[in-house]
Amino acid sequence: MCLMEKKILICGHRSFVATGLINKFKTAGIDFDCFSRGKEERNGNVVTGDVFLMHQNSELSENYDIVVNYILLKGKSVEENLQYCQSLLQFCKDKHVKHLIQISSISVYPNESLEVDETSAIEEDYHNKGGYASIKVAVDHYLMEHPIGGLQVSFVRPGYIYTKNQDISKAGILVSKFGLNILLGDKRTTLPLICREKIHEALLRIIQTDKKESVYLLLNKDKEEGTKYNFVIRQWNVKPICLPYFFLMVIAKGLKSIGIAKQHHYLKIVGLFKRTWFNSAKTEQALNLDLGKRKIAVIG
């Protein structure tokens, strides 16, 4: 089946990461619909409705070949996000979907991992992650543990996402107070980056490619380029004060050993000093795509 004969559904098309994908699909001549939260109705190729009852939405009456899922219910519990996943999988089963492309994140990997590629296992316990990452871990496990006959699931795991001409967020990277710039990490803390437009290009190639991979890592794999410290110096032209690695790790290990700090508390400290190198070479080869170095970064 050629690309123009495929029917695609984009779930969560209004998200930051998805912005611009619609124009990319239109230019490529792709037949697609969009779905997001709201009153149950259809406006052109945009359908809204209850995400927990997606499989019962009467406006999504067609069969689809591919579903691209961006939806993550921020401010909702892990259980509520899994409830949406249950409806999503039922929808895929009912509509004979052949390929589900799940927009995941590199945050699903264990904080203590030293090297990650497309074959690496993700974090086993979502409680070891905070907020956003915990939901991503739980959702990925749910999708892997509930296979649907005839449906292939691909996990697209991008690094920290940036795009042009938007305000830069320091969240999770730098705290600037009272004339001081405190790096949330040290000189070796990794921060792999990926341009949003590069993600869209990769998605188009995933859709076009007959051989589907289970995991795609989308990020710049350059070790020197991908650190918080270098990013902050280039982006904000400041030399930040680093957190003391050995001091904080000794305290964290001590509190854990006497039972004051739980494992998930300890791992969050480890996450501040993440040393993980993400090797996206297999993805670049599979998609014939150079993920390259950044030129301007905005964290999304």
What are these regions (language model features)?
Residues 137, 162-173, 205-216:
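Glycine/proline-rich active-site loop of Rossmann-fold NAD(P)-dependent oxidoreductases
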Residues 87-131:
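Conserved Rossmann-fold NAD(P)-dependent oxidoreductase catalytic core, especially the SDR/UDP-sugar
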Residues 242, 262-300:
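C-terminal amphipathic/interface module of NAD(P)-dependent oxidoreductases
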Residues 149-191, 196:
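NAD(P)-dependent short-chain dehydrogenase/reductase
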Residues 202-263, 300:
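Mid/C-terminal beta-alpha module of Rossmann-like enzyme folds, strongest
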Residues 114-161:
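Catalytic helix-loop patch of NAD(P)-dependent Rossmann-fold dehydrogenases
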Residues 44, 48-87, 91-94:
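NAD(P)H-binding glycine-rich loop region in Rossmannoid oxidoreductase-like domains
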Residues 8-28:
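N-terminal Rossmann NAD(P)H-binding glycine-rich loop of SDR-like oxidoreductase domains
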